[in-house]
């Protein structure tokens, strides 16, 4: 869709990448290849122009829903249930369906209800400045907020790079018609509180996002006032609850009024609840069912919903990343496993950097590195001099002479002990140095850097 293309073009432009092989599709597009054809069906989600994908192959038809919900009163276009049903009537071998809300019973809240509730808050807070945080990708929500602001004679100031980019793209694509409603931060600061709405990122409590900085009092352009109203038109993504609570607590300490989805229905998930998931299965009537996009418990629950809707239990597959299924002549069978997971890009190398290297880099960036250099004479099994110690990003050597001497002493003792061993080898010596220093450094400094022992064999000349 045009919205996605504009966002990709903007990302490429930021990185000075020229790429012209981007093509815009719509619901009527059919992509034909040598071995299979691809078509699309419109779905409803929190992002605009979302579509599911249908892949027609000689061995059967595969449907992938993408993220979706069924909203009978959406702000944007409705899902094309008629096309889904037609595809289902022709026969679907495999349905792969979004499992994000598979644990949630019932039907997801309509975006129109959110629309009404946000409108009521705006009406009840006519004299206050409104600061509203939501997902930048939720274009139809932002469209409604702008329309509500226009009804209430408010201008909208944008805060947060992703919010600014998304609104810019949405204006280009025609989702928003009224460009004059958007003003700059400087203009907002010169307007009365009841004449402006600050639309910002940070609904998930991200430390560097606009709302978090406003709550902390570190935002360069916005200072909270006691009569301000802050609206979280969102719900915490799993794992972000603590960050969101921290931001909300900071706002309460500033004395502002806060609205959250827990208090009012001012956010709707973009993912289908159980009854909507059942409807998707009923529309496509697949022979095989593969729930995806969710934790294992969500996938398992979704698979059980498939069985409830008529799919043979033996024809449901709860997979982990990397699991392979083979589709041959309409029959699906397990096909082993492939390597799957993060692919790290390191300069010009792709996929060559393992997680251990990334872990070391994170550790170095947080705690620094400590290098111990020792010269030994393996032939005579003696340590030549005191080990040298240097650090980067951990401590300053000149300001911690006592600590450095202790490190040297511990290292020296470990090396001498290893040299006396009958089965001495370099790797064991290095491991002993590391294991000996970790508890000491943790106790003395509260941090443990990467410890890198370097042991060199120096040959000494014997006197005749």
Feature names for model-found ranges:
Residues 357-450, 455-458:
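Conserved bacterial/organellar gene-expression machines centered on ribosome-associated P-loop NTPases
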Residues 108-114, 179, 200-216, 239-243, ...:
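A general structural motif
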Residues 92, 127, 277-294, 449:
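Proline-aspartate-enriched helix->loop->beta-strand connector
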Residues 159-234, 330-358:
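A contiguous, basic/glycine-rich beta-loop/short-helix subdomain that forms a polymer-engagement track
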Residues 251-272, 276:
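Generic long, charged, amphipathic alpha-helical segments
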Residues 123-130, 150-154, 226-231, 259-261, ...:
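Short, surface-exposed connector motifs at secondary-structure boundaries
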Residues 1-191, 209-223, 242-246:
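His/Asp/Glu-rich metal-coordinating catalytic cores
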Residues 290-330:
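Anionic-ligand-binding alpha/beta catalytic cores of soluble enzymes and soluble regulatory domains
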């Amino acid at each position: 869709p045009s919205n996605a293309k504009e966002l990709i073009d903007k990302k490429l432009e930021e990185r000075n990448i020229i790429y012209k092989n981007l093509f815009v599709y719509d619901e009527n597009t059919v992509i034909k290849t040598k071995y299979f054809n691809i078509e699309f069906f419109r779905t409803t989600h929190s992002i605009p122009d979302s579509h599911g994908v249908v892949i027609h192959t000689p061995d059967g038809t595969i449907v992938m829903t993408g993220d979706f919900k069924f909203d009978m009163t959406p702000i944007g276009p409705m899902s094309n249930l008629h096309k889904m049903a037609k595809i289902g009537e022709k026969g679907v071998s495999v349905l792969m369906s979004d499992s994000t809300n598979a644990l949630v019973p019932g039907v997801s809240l309509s975006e129109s209800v959110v629309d009404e509730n946000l409108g009521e808050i705006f009406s009840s807070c006519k004299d206050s400045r409104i600061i509203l945080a939501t997902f930048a990708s939720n274009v139809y929500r932002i469209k409604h907020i702008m329309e509500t602001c226009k009804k209430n004679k408010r201008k909208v100031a944008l805060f947060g790079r992703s919010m600014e980019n998304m609104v810019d793209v949405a204006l280009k694509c025609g989702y928003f018609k009224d460009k004059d409603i958007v003003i700059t931060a400087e203009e907002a600061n010169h307007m009365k509180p009841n004449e402006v709405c600050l639309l910002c990122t940070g609904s998930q409590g991200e430390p560097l996002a606009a709302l978090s900085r406003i709550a902390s009092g570190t935002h360069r352009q916005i200072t909270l006032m006691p009569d301000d109203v802050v609206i979280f038109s969102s719900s915490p993504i799993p794992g972000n609850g603590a960050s969101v609570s921290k931001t909300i607590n900071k706002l309460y300490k500033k004395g502002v009024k806060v609205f959250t989805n827990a208090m009012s229905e001012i956010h709707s998930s973009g993912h289908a609840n159980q009854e909507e998931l059942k409807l998707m299965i009923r529309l496509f009537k697949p022979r095989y069912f593969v729930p995806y996009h969710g934790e294992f418990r969500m996938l398992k629950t979704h698979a059980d919903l498939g069985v409830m809707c008529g799919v043979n239990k033996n024809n449901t597959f709860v997979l982990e990343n990397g699991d392979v299924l083979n589709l041959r002549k309409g029959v699906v069978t397990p096909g082993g496993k492939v390597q799957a997971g993060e692919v790290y890009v390191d300069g010009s190398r792709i996929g060559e950097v393992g997680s251990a290297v990334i872990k070391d880099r994170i550790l170095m960036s947080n705690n620094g590195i400590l290098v111990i250099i020792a010269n030994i004479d393996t032939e005579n099994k003696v340590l030549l001099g005191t080990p040298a110690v240097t650090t980067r990003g951990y401590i300053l050597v000149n300001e911690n002479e006592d600590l450095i001497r202790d490190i040297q002493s511990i290292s020296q003792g470990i090396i001498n002990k290893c040299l006396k061993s009958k089965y001495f080898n370099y790797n064991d010596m290095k491991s002993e140095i590391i294991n000996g220093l970790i508890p000491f450094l943790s106790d003395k400094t509260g941090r443990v850097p990467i410890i890198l022992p370097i042991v060199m064999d120096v040959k000494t000349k014997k006197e005749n």
